[in-house]
From Swiss-Prot:
Pathway participation: Cell wall biogenesis; peptidoglycan biosynthesis
UniProt source species: Herminiimonas arsenicoxydans
EC number of the protein: 2.4.99.28
Family that this chain belongs to: Belongs to the glycosyltransferase 51 family.
Gene label: mtgA
Keywords: Cell inner membrane, Cell membrane, Cell shape, Cell wall biogenesis/degradation, Glycosyltransferase, Membrane, Peptidoglycan synthesis, Transferase, Transmembrane, Transmembrane helix
Main location: membrane
Translocase as UniProt keyword: no
GO MF annotation, one: peptidoglycan glycosyltransferase activity
UniProt-recorded name of the protein: Biosynthetic peptidoglycan transglycosylase
UniProt topology in membrane: Single-pass membrane protein
Length: 231
């Protein structure tokens, strides 16, 4: 019995220690990124692997640019489209989550997510695209770590540089070049609004750029951009 108790003790303790070590890794890695730009993210590496399964020579389109070299049009458009209370919440917008839940219940399917910019960044940096309560819980923990270490401008700068914008396209600079042949600094308001609208499903819109929904949503974001509060 004594041996069984010891075995049970270690069977319980070891997973707990592994989880705690993982959280420590996340915490310290985020602290490092306060002053150092991430070379890639978990999601970027995952997508590169998918592309290279089809073409071993495939590479991602990605170029880091500083926050000040990204058009305010794009910043305002993304906040208006993805997270209107970005400057006001502490990582999770509980009101937005409640509204998204109510909308999904009315529609009978998932049509709204309610994830903030910080939550999206947490997922992109460290996690897979799998959907589970465990992954969602980890996303929440990383979200609060990001908000602890970084100010809003730094969170937004990293987000703008690593978010997916198409098939193998990551970051504002690569997106501006891919879709409009210009730099992220030179994006016009209509261009920025369209890029922001693509974010929920970028690979689809990369190959379906003329959909009616994309046009309608772009017009709506253009009207909302003026009230977006930048960090």
């Amino acid at each position: 019995m004594k041996i069984l108790r010891k075995l049970l003790f270690w069977l319980i303790l070891v997973p707990i220690l592994l989880v705690l070590l993982m959280q420590l890794y996340f915490f310290l890695q985020i602290g490092w990124w306060v002053n150092h730009n991430p070379d890639s993210t978990s999601f970027m590496r995952q997508q590169l692997s998918v592309l290279q399964d089809k073409n071993p020579q495939a590479q991602l389109k990605h170029k880091w640019v500083p926050y000040k070299r990204i058009s305010n049009n794009l910043k305002r458009a993304i906040i208006a489209s993805e997270d209107s209370n970005f400057s006001g919440h502490e990582g999770i917008d509980w009101d937005a989550l409640e509204k998204a839940y109510e909308k999904n219940v009315r529609k009978g399917k998932v049509v709204a997510g309610g994830s903030t910019i910080t939550q999206q960044l947490a997922k992109n940096l460290f996690l897979s695209g799998d959907r589970s309560y465990i992954r969602k819980g980890q996303e929440v923990v990383i979200t609060y770590m990001l908000e602890y270490w970084m100010d809003k401008e730094r969170i937004f700068e990293i987000y703008l540089n690593v978010v997916e914008w198409g098939v193998g396209v990551f970051g504002a600079e690569a997106a501006a070049q891919h879709y409009y042949g210009t730099s992220a600094a030179q994006l016009s308001a209509p261009q920025a609004a369209r890029l922001a609208v693509m974010l929920p499903n970028p690979r689809f819109y990369d190959t379906h750029r003329g959909t009616a929904y994309l046009g309608r949503r772009t017009d709506l974001i253009l009207r909302r951009m003026g009230s977006a509060e930048l960090p």
